[in-house]
Design a protein with these regions (language model features):
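Conserved SAM/SAH-binding beta-strand->alpha-helix loop
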Residues: 114-118
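A short SAM/SAH-binding and catalytic strip from SAM-dependent methyltransferases
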Residues: 160-185
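Short beta-strand element of Class I
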Residues: 107-112
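C-terminal substrate-binding/active-site "lid" region of AdoMet-derived donor-dependent transferases
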Residues: 182-246
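Conserved SAM-binding loop of SAM-dependent methyltransferases across substrates and taxa
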Residues: 92-106
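S-adenosyl-L-methionine
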Residues: 2-81, 121-168
């Protein structure tokens, strides 16, 4: 992948720089965050890999959405220890990168996405954190095949070999893609997520596989035993619904 994505492509690279500038222009971070690292990470990624389109992951909507998510996670959890954070459908790792720029007490972040290209790009963008005892590590994994009680993990190493299997507890699970699959409510949330697990869930309106018409419908779909945040974000003609709490 490295050879393919590092091929010269001036038009794509210029487009990526424009996308990154739009993304950075719409970040609204709280005083507890520092976005200098995400600026450098995007700059280095675009310079090193000009032949990949990042527009699906780095855009105005994601910038505003991720800022909202992070601000409220910081507000809810402050300096409480969060342990291992699982980001489902994490794409190229932008949300994870922004979370690690905060003062949240995160042990490490696992960026899960079924798209293998995302794993490569995420690990490249976060290479310093990958080398830091896997403070960040992307994996190609189906969210329906994760054990959310205690997950047993094998990851592909840089030399193409597979690591020894190890176990970890996903203490905080972030899913910003509740509207992107039709079977999330019952097959995933109800059946797979253990009680007392910390959750951050986001659904949305619009042209997605499972659109939620309003906040009330989204709330009913994902009941929690202890709700710590419930809110709505409007970006252009789309609304996002978010719940933070304990299942």
């Amino acid at each position: 992948m490295a050879n393919q994505y590092s091929e010269k492509n001036n038009a794509q690279q210029l487009g990526n720089y424009r996308q990154a500038m739009e993304f950075l222009a719409h970040i609204t971070l709280s005083k507890n965050t520092d976005n200098d690292k995400i600026v450098d990470k995007l700059k280095d990624l675009i310079y090193s890999y000009p032949n990949i389109d990042i527009s699906s992951f780095v855009n105005k909507h994601h910038s505003i959405l991720y800022s909202w998510i992070i601000q409220n996670i910081v507000r809810v959890y402050g300096q409480k220890y969060l342990g291992t954070v699982y980001i489902l459908g994490g794409g190229i790792g932008v949300l994870g990168a922004m979370l690690l720029d905060t003062k949240l007490r995160i042990e490490n972040i696992r960026n899960l996405d079924i798209n293998g290209t995302c794993k490569f790009i995420a690990d490249e963008m976060m290479k310093d954190e990958v080398l830091d005892n896997w403070k960040f590590k992307a994996t190609t994994q189906d969210l329906f095949k994760v054990n959310y009680q205690t997950n047993r993990v094998e990851v592909e190493l840089p030399d193409g070999t597979i690591s020894k299997e190890f176990s970890e507890v996903p203490a905080l699970v972030i899913n910003t893609n509740c509207s992107h699959l039709n079977n999330m409510e019952n097959d995933w949330y109800e059946k797979m997520i253990p009680k007392t697990r910390k959750m951050v869930l986001v659904g949305e309106t619009g042209n997605v596989p499972h659109s939620y018409p309003n906040q009330k419908t989204f709330n009913a779909a994902y009941p929690m035993s202890f709700e710590q945040y419930n809110g709505v974000l409007t970006v252009d003609d789309k609304q996002y619904f978010m719940k933070i709490g304990i299942k």
